[in-house]
Amino acid sequence: MNFNIIIKIICENIQLAPIINMVSYKELFNINDTDLIVPSDTLSEAVYDNSKLDYIFQNVNRRNRDEVEDESINIQTQLPKQQNQQISKDMSEVGSKQVSEIRPDSDSRWKLLRVMAGAHQGWVRSCTVDPVTNKWFVTGSSDSTIKIWDLASSNLKATITGHIMGVRSLAVSSRYPYLFSGSEDKTVKCWDLERTNSSSGCQIRNYHGHVGGIYAMALHPELDLLFTGGRDSVIRVWDLRSRTEIMVLSGHRSDITSIASQIGDPQIITSSMDATIRLWDIRKATTQLALTHHSKSIRSMAMHPQEMTMCSGDTSGNLKEWLLPGGELLNEFGHSGENKIINTLSINPSNNTLFSGYDDGRMEFYDYVSGDLLQSDATTPVTGSTESAIYASTFDMSGLRLITCEGDKSIKIWGEE
């Protein structure tokens, strides 16, 4: 399939820029049309019986922690060996090394590589990187649009419209050519990135049920389940096959700010503005454990991609590292005080660096193992703007680039010296 040709007739919801080179998931994974998500009456009936999700779980090959880590390494070694010249000239040469072999020096510093000024017409509130090829990333904005960008060149690949309010959360499937978005308009939408010849457009599904804005979402890494949460303080679990809401997880007393999903237990972890983190047993639809160590609202939480650990940050500048599945507190660091609101956290597994982005534009890089502060910096608003907040961030899959989404309507790309 020549994707460069069929993308020219992309659905009416997407406006394309001239440069198009998006991955074909059907080719990459050898997926046939019959393999795509379709309603399953058997599954729908099963999730509503007394056993809840037992039907799903009994069909999943459970893997131990070592196998999960091996899979993450295999994904990394499939990434391109030669980095794009536009990025490489600003960074140390990586030559033909495998991405998994790259271990930057501990004394290296992150510096600004590129400013995508005017990337959106409003605050840039969410971002995520393509988990399959590491070639593109997606951003959502308070201007209600979603944009897809080439990671190497930062060229705009597509603009997706359909939400009527700001886009606060995004998730890209690693199993299907689907993008999910959550908005302040209380809707979750599913976009088919390869449905280019459909007269109905690329928006293929709506998930209705939330009564407030949707601020967080996550896809289960193995099961066809989507988790969403937001202002209504509950987490809704959606069956992607039957398109139905299969359960509601209640317990938080304020906005849901982050959701993380993993293969092992606890399969769902959430953070909230009520200053708690909850670990959920989704087989029983109950809270397995509530962590109450934070004294202020938690705006961000990040899970280590290769370890059973996670980190959370609150509005007083405190960072806490946790061990899973038991929720033991491993470390506390950060700088507590006023005006130290942490909006976003990201973990770079290639060198165990934790990035913390603040509401006042400050940026901090920590050694994830020791909690030592490695670098403290600040972003500079683009000309004509006084907004400096960093709202969202993510490392690419190689760990060589950091993407920050900011209040000055820009996107910034950072790399190590």
Curated annotation (Swiss-Prot):
PROSITE patterns: WD_REPEATS_1, WD_REPEATS_2, WD_REPEATS_REGION. Coiled coil: none annotated. WD repeats lie at residues 119-159, 162-201, 209-248, 251-290, 293-334, 337-376, 385-417. GO terms for cellular component: catalytic step 2 spliceosome; cytoplasm; post-mRNA release spliceosomal complex; precatalytic spliceosome; Prp19 complex. Associated with the spliceosome. Belongs to the WD repeat PRL1/PRL2 family. This is Pre-mRNA-splicing factor PRP46. It comes from the Eukaryota.
